[in-house]
Amino acid sequence: MSHTLSQSGVFMGEPLNGSGDLLPPEDMYDACRIIARYIPWRGGLEWDFGPVQTMEIPAEFKQLIERYLKTVLGSPAPHRGWKIPETTLCYPWIKRMFPEIRYIFWVRNPRDCITGGHLTDDLRDFGIQYPATDDVHRRRAISWKYQNDLVRATGLPTCGIKVRLEDFVLHQERELGRLEQYLGFPLARIPVKRDPIGRHKREPAGELYDFLVPAMQEHGYDI
């Protein structure tokens, strides 16, 4: 999605890595650790996302986000944005800091997500507690659930659209049409790879964890 936006004339900040993530990321990572202090772990796979919805956002958090986004916020480009996966961990306060921007919620089948590694695989790296496990796929699945629960608890912003990776790959023209109507400007057509779809059928991905089932059904994925 980031590459599509960049090729469509959206300034995505600078510099970017090969995945289209805005660099350097350290300020965003530190911001994630700050918001985690105010999300109590209830035990099991439950967290209390209530406090961060209404509390005053710490000045330190705002400073970190503004510093991370300095090239985006300071750009005169008519269309601006950014992408880095860890934004999701900060979503409640990002939504409140930037209530009028247009959000694109990029969703992927969690069974495919957990076949590969991500920086958020171990939530403890960002100060988030969860049941300890040596099973790397279970850790990844817990991280996916946490992030999905966090977004659901926070609710949609004023302007938001959900796009499933699978739909974008298999029905690119249809999904680009939805996005063009939502964003209000034409989007570039770039080649997309189909191999990320159904990866859990070809690579080790652990079991189908029961705690993922409700969210998979919510997003329209087969069980």
Sequence positions of predicted segments:
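PAPS-dependent sulfotransferases, especially Golgi type II membrane carbohydrate sulfotransferases
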Residues: 118-119, 126-129, 133, 145, ...
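Short catalytic/ligand-binding loop motif for oxyanion handling, primarily in non-cytosolic enzymes
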Residues: 2, 21, 88-91, 111-116, ...
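PAPS/PAP-binding and catalytic site of the sulfotransferase fold
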Residues: 1-10, 94-98, 162-187
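Conserved phosphate-donor/acceptor-positioning beta-strand/loop module used by diverse small-molecule
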Residues: 83-86, 94-119
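Surface-exposed cleft-lining segments at the edges of enzyme active sites
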Residues: 75-80, 120-140
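Soluble or luminal CAZymes and related metallo-dependent hydrolases
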Residues: 56-64, 83-86, 136-147, 171
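Glycine-rich phosphate-binding loop used to anchor ATP phosphates in small-molecule kinases
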Residues: 59-93
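PAPS-dependent sulfotransferase catalytic core
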Residues: 1-63, 195-199
